[in-house]
Amino acid sequence: MVAEPHSETSSTPRRRRWRTTAAVTLFTAVLAACGGGGGSGGGSAPNGDVPSNEPPPPVPSAPAAQPTTAADAVRLADQASFGPTEALVTTIKAQGAAAWVAAQMALPATSRYSSGQGDAIHTYTGTADFCTGRGDDCWRDWYSTSPLLWDFYRNAVGQPDQLRQRTAFALQQILVVSNLDVSGTYGFRNYHNNLLAYAFGNYRDVLRKVTLSPVMGDFLNNANNDKDAPNENYARELLQLFSIGTCELESDGSLKGGKCSPTYTNDTVRAYAYALTGWTYPAGGASRYGCWPKGANCTYYGGDMVKVDQYHDTKERQLLGGVKLASGHTADTALETVLDSVMNHPNTPPFIGKQLIQQLVSSNPSSAYVGRVSAAFAAGSYKGFGTGKRGDLAATVAAVLLDDEARTETPGRSAGKLREPVMMFTGVLRALDGTTDGDALGWWWGETMQQHVFRPPSVFNFYPPDYPVPGTTLVGPTFGIHNANTALNRLNFLVYLLDWGGSSATGSTVPGAVGTKVNLAAMSTDAANAGTLVDRLSMLALGRTLPATARTEVVKAVEASGSNAANRVKTAAYLVFGAPQYHVQR
């Protein structure tokens, strides 16, 4: 059993386990039978927050409603939201996939990051430690991403703009920054609000905001980069992770010529590093030690980085695709040329398109599927979605979700993906009418399951997109953080919600604390009939009933749990959401 969080006192009584040994034993039988082992929105923005002034992308014309099946509705909810609810499944069934995606893209962005403190950590000039007199939660509220994590989970569980949030979450796992290396709550708030704002915009605009982000500038050493000997970190990751990848690709994502031909050399990286010199923090920061280097701004995260001409390298530089920066160019010209060169590279559509498929739908998409998504990215349009401009994310996301391979009722053996911990947390909470303030899902469960949102271990995220599944020829990114301990802790998370009752708000210092808990009242209406209850939960979790043998065992366990409605629902929910079919999302 995983330990309780440090915020719990040793005097807190443990709740008695409701499951009998027999019920736990039955879980093993189920595994064998299965073939396997409230939003935080309003209020004024704290200092340093920068609202997006970009016009929203055009709303796609609404496709006609084409009702679909419950199985397809649950599958789409798994792919495009933070988990099915009965109300969401009903909506998707009535609208159909295309109409629902269009309706989601037309929704206003109700989810934004707003919790935490402002920019005073970068305007403070006093001699005492900044946190002196600011209470025990100073580091949490001013420096860490814990306040963003509260907003993330509150919005994921409760806000309606689900597709925008899922797309932004996919982007943040490609365009990675980490609170492990950079501190400043308000800066991370700006960075991730930009990903939400541009989720259905253009990938070129996303790359521009990321390149000019002072948080990214600190994370990958491009802020105040020395023109005489520039740090190459950001230039390398811009090419390797954020745009073209390391091997030349066909438009369907396969290796060009059947082997890895490098897309760039060290000289190429160096040329991009020189091209991206000359950017410093936005104005607004202060320090009692003064700003360094001379002529640059002090550390400050309240906006995009700004150019300092004297620190920009103006020599002729050769970029990819035959693009050349002429001698005497400006920092602005260099930036736009860099972005054009990577956006026009033939690798970018399949490289980014495949990662979006992996994040939303399937770890091992067919080359044909990647090719169709790549074509949508390149054309900027897909069946009425998009502006017709290369890199349009509305078109690309629509292509990912509406492709036949995503919508098929009979997915192939290599289709689907291991449900990542974040999606398990939110999926169970949403399915069981849960609420959360997010607090328990960070330092406790996020750390336990190796996916503490906003704190990936490196720029390579929590797991690489090409992580090999042992003993197979498949890749499974989420398997990079999956092992015997995390597999057991998936079940322990269900124990935490169903047996312990989750977490309460008592004693919490989280603003607007509600704890983390589920509400089983709606499911209790079917508790008297074990078969009906199990099927209702299975349809919500899987989009179908459990396989016959597994269903029989789960129904027996529910019937053996007694007549208490709550215990019957807990037993059924534990066994359904603990089943392998739930954790392997297909």
Task: Give residue ranges: language-model regions.
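Bacterial Sec-dependent N-terminal signal peptides
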Residues: 24, 28-62
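N-terminal mature-domain "stem" immediately C-terminal to a signal peptide or N-terminal signal-anchor/transmembrane
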Residues: 59-111
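Short, flexible active-site-proximal loops enriched in glycine and acidic residues
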Residues: 163-167, 179-186, 229
